[in-house]
């Protein structure tokens, strides 16, 4: 799918940011090595916070007036958001909203702002977890900053297959997929595609753990 995209989108890059938690993608150097090990080096990859951060405004935000993103995001005028849809222990689900809310936020400041209880836009200490409701509101505001920045030049693709109740960040400890493969959804509306994905998961099996949990 990625190869096909790049054939039809001239001068495109895959964009990433480093992680907040220590691991194989914590630094730019280890991140690039991880991409290489996993065979994801057949296209240009821009680790957007490699050269620093930039603050994007959150218009009419409840918790944030602005949020920290990987600096290189401002080098782009459009974005295709490709997301593996799944569950999430704190956010309820991991869809396009979470993908851009966490995925575009830089690995130190922005991700800490979203995950922590921030005061005056200052990130909280790692591990000072907010309530699930606050985390989801933080993610919504971070995603809004990205959507507002790109305007009409952003499209979302949710892949509904091999869906676990756990986020991909759980790695090998993630629960085995419990929801039947459904297909691929595409939309220019962030809320519509994530809501449709949730509805399809719940309707696919009312007895699934995903449905009972979320």
Kindly label every feature range from the protein language model.
Residues 1-214:
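Extended, low-polarity segments enriched in aliphatic/aromatic residues
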């Amino acid at each position: 799918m990625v190869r096909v995209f790049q054939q039809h989108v001239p001068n495109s890059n895959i964009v990433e940011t480093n992680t907040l938690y220590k691991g194989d993608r914590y630094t730019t150097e280890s991140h690039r090595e991880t991409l290489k090990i996993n065979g994801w080096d057949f296209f240009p990859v821009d680790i957007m916070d490699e050269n620093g951060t930039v603050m994007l405004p959150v218009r009419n935000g409840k918790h944030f007036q602005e949020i920290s993103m990987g600096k290189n995001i401002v080098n782009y005028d459009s974005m295709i958001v490709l997301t593996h849809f799944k569950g999430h222990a704190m956010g309820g689900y991991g869809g396009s909203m979470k993908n851009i809310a966490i995925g575009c936020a830089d690995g130190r400041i922005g991700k800490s702002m979203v995950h922590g209880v921030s005061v005056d836009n200052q990130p909280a200490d790692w591990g000072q977890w907010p309530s699930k409701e606050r985390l989801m509101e933080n993610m919504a505001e971070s995603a809004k900053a990205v959507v507002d920045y790109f305007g009409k030049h952003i499209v979302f693709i949710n892949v509904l297959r091999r869906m676990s109740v756990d986020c991909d960040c759980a790695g090998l400890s993630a629960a085995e997929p419990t929801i039947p493969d459904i297909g691929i959804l595409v939309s220019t509306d962030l809320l519509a595609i994530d809501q449709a994905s949730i509805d399809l998961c719940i309707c696919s099996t009312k007895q699934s753990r995903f449905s009972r949990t979320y």
